């Protein structure tokens, strides 16, 4: 955070230099024809200001929207993005903040809705999704929260309703569902639960009424219904029985 603050301060001072015309010599090359010193460049609709050393970008580079509002604050080391890269919309609101090492995402990448409201937090380690991934609804409530290892889901992932309640919870191992698969009612009670092995339901399945009483019971084998499946009313009386074999209804 200290590094980010210093970078922003440097950007502020550089803005003062540009606006006051303090930097007189721009877009110069050295005796070997390599870019050196302070440069102004244009890329698409963005004007960029920053320094070159030995033909490589160095330090803080600042981009501007066509309306004069800062669009980007990017840190460079020997021509590669290293440090924070910050993006700002035309209204001046922060909408993306990434961390880089040698032009590779490393650390948290944070995105924002219009108005700088948090949209997502995703953790990278040298370009690979490793760690937390958290998504938000526009009102700030969590939409999804889980963990990754080598670009694959690993551990518990939860999805949330717009009211903030957990709606679905799966357990992953190396990108595949291995462990409990659960769904929930808005009151927090379990709606359904079953184990999974390599993305397939396996073993006992249970589905409940919102008050917690058992509604449906059955069994899966390799992702297919097997044996007797029973449906109960809220008094616990069996009101329906079906028999399956290899996923096919037999009676």
Functional labels for PLM-detected ranges:
Residues 1-7:
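Intrinsically disordered, low-complexity terminal and linker regions enriched in polar/acidic
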Residues 7-17:
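Bacterial N-terminal signal peptides
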Residues 2, 18-161, 165-185, 189-209, ...:
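Periodic aromatic/glycine/histidine/acidic cluster detector
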């Amino acid at each position: 955070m200290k590094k980010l603050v210093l970078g922003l301060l440097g950007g502020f001072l550089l803005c003062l230099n540009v606006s006051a015309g303090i930097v007189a010599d721009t877009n110069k090359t050295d005796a070997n024809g390599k870019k050196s010193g302070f440069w102004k460049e244009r890329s698409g609709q963005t004007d960029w200001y920053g320094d070159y050393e030995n033909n490589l970008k160095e330090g803080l580079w600042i981009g501007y929207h066509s309306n004069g509002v800062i669009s980007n604050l990017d840190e460079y080391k020997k021509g590669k993005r290293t440090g924070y890269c910050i993006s700002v919309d035309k209204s001046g609101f922060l909408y993306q903040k990434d961390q880089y090492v040698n032009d590779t995402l490393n650390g948290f990448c944070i995105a924002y809705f219009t108005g700088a409201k948090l949209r997502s937090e995703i953790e990278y380690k040298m370009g690979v999704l490793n760690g937390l991934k958290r998504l938000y609804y526009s009102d700030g409530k969590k939409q999804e929260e889980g963990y990754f290892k080598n670009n694959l889901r690993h551990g518990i992932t939860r999805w949330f309703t717009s009211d903030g309640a957990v709606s679905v919870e799966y357990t992953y191992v190396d990108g595949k569902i291995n462990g409990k698969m659960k769904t929930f009612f808005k009151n927090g009670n379990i709606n359904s639960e079953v184990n999974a092995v390599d993305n397939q339901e396996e073993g006992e399945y249970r589905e409940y009424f919102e008050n917690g009483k058992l509604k449906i019971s059955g069994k899966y084998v390799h992702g297919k219904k097997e044996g007797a499946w029973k449906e109960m009313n809220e008094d616990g009386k069996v009101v329906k029985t079906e028999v399956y074999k290899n996923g096919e209804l037999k009676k």
